[in-house]
Amino acid sequence: YSSLREELSEAGGAVIDLSGFPNLSESVIHGLAVVASGFLPARAPVLLMDGVDHTERLLRITAELGLAGAIVDVKTIGSAPAIAALPTVGIVLSKQKSEMSVLLRIDWTPSSSDILTVVAAGMHGILSEPFLGQSEPPPTTVKKIATTLDTDIQFREKEMRGWLQQMGAANLNDLKRHHLRSVTYEAAAMSGLRLEGYRQPLPMWSRK
């Protein structure tokens, strides 16, 4: 307990991973959040994290506690799970009235299209380890890591600016779900996005 207090007192924030404690009651989760907030420096953020199957509960508890945000964890390699999570996260977010940051945690290096898709769905960004899935060995020194990340970020920014212009959005803040299109039937069926060339989502998403 004392070591936890000491560590958190010097931390910039805390993430409580609920997936590691699947049987915790909501009262215990509330208690953990209160303890973390009390031990952290003033204004340091506390976030909750859980799997995409528990998105509704995750965001509800985050809102009730007035925490800084939530992390929706998608653990399957590939872009399909992120697409499949869009309807669930988007619907739950639309019901939330409180201000919070919502991030999508993935276990692959996101492409520019992944980033735009997640932001258009109403989330605020992607959480991922750098250099995942690369064929070349990752840089090891601080200087090389910083240089590589800076180059990668600049490339993605340039690529995303071009796509935003094509979609008619001035910046990321203007990007909405209706700007997105699916290029395959499978992606359209999973996400509820409109298939390229069609004005409406697929029938299973259009039914009321």
Question: Would you name each region that the model predicts?
Answer:
Residues 91-101, 112-116, 120-208:
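Alpha/beta catalytic cores of nucleotide-metabolism and tRNA/nucleoside-modifying enzymes
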Residues 1-107, 112-140, 196:
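Alpha/beta enzyme core
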